UniProtKB/Swiss-Prot annotation:
Reaction(s) catalysed (UniProt annotation): N(2)-formyl-N(1)-(5-phospho-beta-D-ribosyl)glycinamide + L-glutamine + ATP + H2O = 2-formamido-N(1)-(5-O-phospho-beta-D-ribosyl)acetamidine + L-glutamate + ADP + phosphate + H(+); L-glutamine + H2O = L-glutamate + NH4(+)
NCBIfam families tied to this protein: FGAM_synth_I, PRK03619.1
Organism: Pyrobaculum aerophilum (strain ATCC 51768 / DSM 7523 / JCM 9630 / CIP 104966 / NBRC 100827 / IM2)
Annotated protein name in UniProt: Phosphoribosylformylglycinamidine synthase subunit PurQ
Domain Glutamine amidotransferase type-1: 2-212
GO cellular component: cytoplasm
Lineage start: Archaea, Thermoproteota, Thermoprotei, Thermoproteales, Thermoproteaceae
EC number(s) given by UniProt: 6.3.5.3, 3.5.1.2
Keywords assigned: ATP-binding, Cytoplasm, Glutamine amidotransferase, Hydrolase, Ligase, Nucleotide-binding, Purine biosynthesis
Subunit structure: Part of the FGAM synthase complex composed of 1 PurL, 1 PurQ and 2 PurS subunits.
Keyword Membrane: no
Biochemical pathway: Purine metabolism; IMP biosynthesis via de novo pathway; 5-amino-1-(5-phospho-D-ribosyl)imidazole from N(2)-formyl-N(1)-(5-phospho-D-ribosyl)glycinamide: step 1/2
The keyword ATP-binding is annotated on this UniProt entry: yes
Length: 212
């Protein structure tokens, strides 16, 4: 099993993802974006951060790289793809997920724990959750307000909307591709996570799905 953790200039959540995978029983591989190639990995995670300093728009420059062409190719083959925070922004900019992430309303950077409801369990990342289950994860973003572009499928919704996101959406998916603004990799260890380990099931679900 090979799980790539894709790193762009400005990515800063990569080691948190590697740690989350380790706690869930797998070993991720940190992959510099120029070294990523389609057909080599069983899953890929786009970690959070500020790729290219959020120039132009959050995720816009990373979305235009050759690496994302390879990610798109893998996604079309059914490889599970996860984008967290800035990774979610990259996926929308690249057209792998519908809609866009725009500045928060009210504006400003938000960094706190939030309650998130699982509303769809039909993905490789959510199928171990119960539909309607509420978990806690931290958020840390200034451009996390989701706006749809036509039809979309929500996987997670905020219990108490922190950023003005349409219909309380915290994460959306399309087949095997999932993006979410909350950070499941920072909610995996009950000894250090302030509000429990609600993100751990996401990683356990991915690993279980890959082992089927």
């Amino acid at each position: 099993m090979r799980i790539a953790v894709l790193k762009f200039p400005g990515t800063n959540g990569d080691y948190d993802v590697l740690r989350a995978l380790e706690l869930a029983g797998a070993r991720g591989e940190l992959v510099w974006y120029r070294d990523y190639a389609a057909g080599k990995y069983d899953a890929v995670v786009l970690a959070g951060g500020f790729s290219y300093g959020d120039r132009l728009r959050a995720g816009a420059i990373a979305a235009a790289t050759k690496a994302m062409d390879h990610v798109r190719e893998d996604a079309e083959r059914g490889v599970p793809v996860l984008g967290i925070c800035n990774g979610f922004q990259i996926l929308t900019e690249a057209g792998l997920l519908p809609g866009a992430l725009i500045p928060n309303d009210p504006p400003g950077f938000i960094s706190r724990w939030v309650a998130v409801r699982v509303v769809d369990t039909r993905t490789p990342f959510t199928y171990l959750y119960e539909e309607g289950e509420v978990v806690y994860m931290p958020i840390a973003h200034g451009e996390g307000r989701y706006v749809p572009a036509g039809e979309y499928k929500a996987a997670f919704k905020y219990v108490d909307n922190p950023n003005g996101s349409y219909d309380n959406v915290a994460g959306v998916y399309e087949k095997n591709v999932l993006g979410l603004m909350p950070h499941p990799e920072r909610a995996v260890d009950p000894h250090v996570s302030r509000r429990g380990a609600g993100g751990l099931k996401l990683w356990l679900g991915l690993i279980s799905w890959l082992r089927r």
